[in-house]
């Protein structure tokens, strides 16, 4: 767009549509933009006087009072034209690109939905392709052999038997071409049925919808190159759309400024003289005439119409961009993954973990209370002077037991704070081992307390008995709680193991689906390659059929030329016989003979004819035979003799060319000059025959 969009008055009027210019072109009938990235290069002209000349008559004194020195208005006009052209080209390019991308996405989606799953489909396709190739090879080999045989027979000679065989060969060749066409049509029909069968097989793919949902959900989590590509395309679309909006606003501002400038110059006009100097007229006193006002109004209307059309195109572009974005999002996500079942299982596991945590917290509180009771029991035991050493040893053992109990309590506290570190959360049966260990520790503690109470009696035995009773009760409650917790932990462990098995099964299903997807993709690629090979084979065979048809036409033309030569040779060989049979002996001289007897000529009287080519038959002078004046048979090749009747006048005006059927009949042997119809020719028949041969030879 090196030139301005408003370079002539006819183009400006063509935008508005209110003028009847037969040479104008529609403003929006733009060519298809090329699919290249980036904006088109817009070279700008720096020669403002040259631009002023190109913008005539709009910069003319009678239209707009813009002098050549006023470069600002010229730059405004130039920027308007360049911006309008670039925006239109950009809108066309982006609209075409969005249409192409939408069509490509539709084809890709249909291709994904039409992929076959069974291996029998691939085998059937390969069998059909092999059958098509076999049929085409057989037909081409047969045609090649027939053409070779025909060429060999043509090279042998030009006898009647060869002509008959040639006619049969031509018929067989035509029949062979028809058979080839029929075979191609049948094979293409069969392949079309196979494609329809592939379309039907998409119903089988719908049965794998749940598995594909899982796979699509997993693919959504990962950033694939395709999603990155779509994101880049959408970002590019958004940038171009923003730039288009900015250009649109800029053009609107320029148009408003131009309109204000035109209004100001209309109100304050200074006419320019013929010498280029401004005349001393007061501004505003000299009003424009009606013609200039109409032209300025048309100019503004044309600009506003272009502005409105650009707005409509921008709206269409935004609509297509939104549709394309929706389509890209739908294709990248494929289908939304419904994970209600998995979320429900996760919620159940979370609730079970919370219940287990609460139970462990309660158990920890009970163990802490039991610890406090045991600490108080240690100080209740009074010292005895007699058994002080024994009591000290028992107290040491008791301290060890209390330390072990503290370890158990600390372990339960850590499990309550962090249930994930629990041994039974991953392995079934580990919780039962922990419960057994805890029970053994409690039993050992109970036995030691009983032994201490038996060895060291004290006046506070009632208190000790109550403490032991409370300890037994607490022990029983703890045992019940531990057993209940063990069962719960076992149940949770079993459920976690089942959940792990289910997750592994889902992982295996996903891997299997990925393998199936890879197989389907490879099958689709193979089918595409086979289809391309079939198309190339079909095009090659079509070219071979065309070449064979051309060869047949050439053979037919050669046959026609050979038949013409044969007819000429036959007529040349029959003319002496016709002329000799036309000279009858008068009946008066031979009254005794009832049959017509031709005059016998001595062999010495006939002088050998001059050999001439058959193309010289049109010139009757070249075919004169040198005979004596008394026994001269022909005056020319036309067969006109002094003793024979003259050719009818109708033969002179007969300019028709013999048809193909007559030539074929003459070539086969059913013409009047063939050996099957030889008879005694009368003088009238001979004359008629000579007239026909002359007319035919003259037209050859």
Swiss-Prot record:
Region of interest called Disordered, as start-end residue ranges on this chain? 1-53, 266-293, 634-659, 671-700
Q: Where in the cell is it found?
A: Cytoplasm, Cytoskeleton
Q: Per the record, where are the segments of Polar residues compositional bias? A: 1-11, 43-53
The GO molecular function terms of this record are:
cytoskeletal protein-membrane anchor activity
Q: In the UniProt record, does the keyword Coiled coil occur? A: yes
Compositionally biased region (Low complexity): 273-284
Identify residues that carry Phosphoserine. Answer: 636
Principal cellular location given in the protein's record = cytoplasm
Per UniProt, the keywords (alphabetical) are: Cell cycle, Cell division, Coiled coil, Cytoplasm, Cytoskeleton, Mitosis, Phosphoprotein
Give the residues annotated as coiled coil.
496-575
Annotated GO biological process: mitotic cytokinesis
* Cellular component, GO annotation: medial cortical node; mitotic actomyosin contractile ring; mitotic actomyosin contractile ring, intermediate layer
Question: Has keyword Ribonucleoprotein?
Answer: no
Assembly behavior: Interacts with cdr2, mid1 and sad1.
General function of this protein: At the onset of mitosis, forms a medial ring structure before the arrangement of the medial actin ring. Essential for the central positioning of the division septum before the cell divides.
Protein name, UniProt field? Mitosis inducer protein blt1
């Amino acid at each position: 767009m090196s030139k301005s969009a408003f370079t002539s008055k006819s183009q400006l009027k063509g935008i508005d549509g209110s003028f009847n210019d037969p040479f104008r072109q529609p403003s929006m009938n733009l060519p298809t933009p090329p699919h290249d990235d980036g904006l088109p290069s817009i070279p700008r002209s720096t020669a403002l006087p040259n631009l002023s000349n190109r913008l005539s008559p709009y910069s003319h004194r009678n239209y707009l009072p813009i002098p050549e020195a006023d470069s600002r208005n010229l730059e405004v006009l130039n920027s308007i034209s360049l911006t309008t052209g670039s925006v239109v080209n950009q809108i066309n390019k982006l609209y075409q690109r969005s249409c192409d991308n939408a069509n490509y996405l539709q084809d890709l989606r249909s291709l994904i939905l039409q992929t076959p799953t069974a291996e029998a489909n691939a085998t059937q396709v390969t069998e059909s392709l092999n059958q098509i190739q076999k049929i085409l090879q057989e037909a081409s080999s047969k045609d090649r052999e027939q053409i070779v045989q025909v060429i060999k027979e043509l090279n042998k000679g030009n006898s009647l038997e060869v002509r008959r065989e040639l006619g049969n060969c031509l018929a067989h060749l035509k029949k062979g071409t028809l058979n080839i066409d029929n075979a191609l049509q049948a094979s293409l029909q069969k392949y079309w049925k196979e494609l329809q069968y592939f379309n039907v097989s998409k119903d089988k793919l719908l049965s794998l919808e749940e598995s594909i949902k899982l796979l699509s959900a997993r693919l959504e989590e990962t950033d694939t190159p395709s999603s990155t590509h779509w994101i880049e395309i959408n970002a590019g679309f958004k940038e171009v759309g923003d730039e288009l909006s900015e250009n649109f606003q800029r053009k609107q501002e320029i148009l408003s400024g131009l309109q204000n400038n035109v209004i100001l110059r209309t109100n304050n006009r200074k006419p320019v003289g013929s010498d280029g100097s401004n005349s001393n007229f007061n501004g505003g006193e000299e009003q424009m005439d009606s013609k200039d006002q109409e032209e300025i109004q048309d100019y503004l209307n044309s600009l506003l119409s272009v502005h409105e059309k650009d707005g409509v195109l921008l709206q269409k572009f935004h609509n297509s961009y939104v549709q394309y974005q929706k389509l890209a999002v739908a294709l990248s996500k494929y289908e939304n993954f419904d994970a209600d079942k998995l979320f429900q299982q996760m919620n159940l596991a979370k609730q079970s973990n919370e219940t287990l945590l609460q139970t462990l917290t309660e158990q920890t509180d009970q163990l802490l209370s039991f610890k406090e009771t045991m600490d108080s029991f240690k100080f209740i035991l009074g010292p005895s002077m007699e058994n002080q050493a024994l009591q000290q040893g028992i107290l040491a053992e008791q301290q060890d037991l209390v330390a072990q109990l503290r370890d158990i309590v600390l372990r339960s506290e850590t499990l309550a704070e962090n249930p994930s570190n629990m041994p039974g959360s991953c392995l079934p049966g580990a919780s039962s081992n922990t419960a057994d260990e805890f029970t053994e520790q409690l039993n050992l503690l109970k036995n030691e307390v009983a032994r201490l109470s038996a060895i060291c009696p004290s006046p506070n035995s009632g208190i000790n008995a109550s403490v032991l009773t409370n300890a037994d009760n607490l022990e029983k409650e703890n045992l019940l709680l531990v057993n209940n917790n063990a069962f719960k932990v076992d149940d949770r462990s079993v459920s976690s193991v089942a959940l792990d098995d289910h997750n592994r099964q889902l992982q295996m299903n996903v891997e299997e689906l990925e393998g199936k997807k890879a197989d389907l993709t490879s099958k689709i690629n193979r089918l595409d390659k086979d289809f391309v090979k079939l198309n190339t084979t079909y095009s090659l065979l079509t070219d071979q059929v065309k070449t064979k048809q051309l060869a047949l036409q050439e053979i037919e033309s050669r046959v026609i030329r050979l038949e013409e030569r044969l007819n000429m040779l036959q007529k040349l060989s029959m003319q002496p016989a016709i002329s000799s049979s036309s000279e009858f002996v008068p009946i008066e001289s031979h009254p005794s003979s009832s049959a017509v007897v031709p005059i016998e000529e001595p062999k010495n009287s006939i002088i050998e004819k001059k050999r001439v080519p058959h193309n010289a038959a049109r010139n009757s002078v070249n075919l004169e035979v040198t005979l004596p004046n008394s026994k001269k048979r022909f005056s020319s090749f036309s067969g006109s003799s002094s003793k024979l009747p003259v050719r009818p006048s109708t033969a002179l005006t007969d300019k028709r060319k013999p048809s193909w059927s007559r030539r074929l009949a003459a070539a086969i042997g059913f013409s009047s000059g063939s050996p099957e119809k030889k008879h005694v020719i009368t003088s009238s028949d001979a004359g008629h025959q000579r007239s026909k041969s002359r007319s035919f030879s003259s037209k050859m």
